[in-house]
């Protein structure tokens, strides 16, 4: 083959290569245009572009914020320890079991930090013990009933220990975190629960709240019927500033419920997933002033929060899968539960399957053995 024939052959090959390259560029541009169109089209809210934006941290409050290793500390599990200060405080031991399950147990331990809100006045040795157990401690003041409610009003507290439970509201002040899963000490973790943090924020308000579906209440010395309505002037901020928000919880339920349980009007506050917010804390305190609006606070913070995040209002609570908080556990519930809720340290309690008593005491024994063998 002479020189000119070779030159013509190479020229043809080069032209073909350029044609292929140009074709690829055109196809890529068409794909990009299609992607942009999908992103703009409200019929495709979960587009690849918007998902990528979350993945790469462009939306720092988006539901994928925890995918980044550097962001793990922005989410946390959180317990609560209040008074009394006695060596035989069963709730102290229960808090230790909770921390052990979330920090060290091979089947349930979390990749997220574990904090404990500790009310000022708790014995220092208990605080130090929780630190050695692996918890990070946040000291908080007691939120007293008299500091919240209007002078002259009273509450129908169901238990002496309930007097400290408004202190749990301090979780809304922990704005160093984006999401907090706060758990009562009598929750026994049975399976890993890290995916609870995948629960998305609520970014938009309802079109219009169904105020007529709110519970009816009466004011003291007044026989008129009233229903709750948010007063944003009293809160000192427009409604739009309260978004995004998050209060996720499981349906409250009664003994003998079906499995899975039916949806309820109210949630159980033994486990909540919240987006801490000073504005929401201020709003909650304003609502708390009038306990006659929320059943005289018979269930303390649970009664209050069920009004503040009523499903018919501007800030409806987010329903979590029932498996995260097994209330009034039945035998049928057990295979599904990630956490069971009850005083399982009580040997003679027949309100729940006895295997949970064995599980709790097994976990307590494991934590004692674990820390005996760990150099502190």
UniProtKB/Swiss-Prot annotation:
This protein's GO CC annotations: cytoplasm; cytosol; Golgi apparatus; membrane; nucleus
S-S bonds: none
Annotated TM spans: 19-39
Any one GO MF annotation of this record: alpha-1,3-galactosyltransferase activity
InterPro entries (UniProt xref): GNT1/Glycosyltrans_8, Nucleotide-diphossugar_trans
SUPFAM superfamilies the UniProt entry points to: Nucleotide-diphospho-sugar transferases (SSF53448)
Record GO biological process: protein N-linked glycosylation; protein O-linked glycosylation
Topology relative to the membrane: Single-pass membrane protein
Superkingdom, taxonomy of origin: Eukaryota
Designated name of the protein: Uncharacterized protein C4C3.09
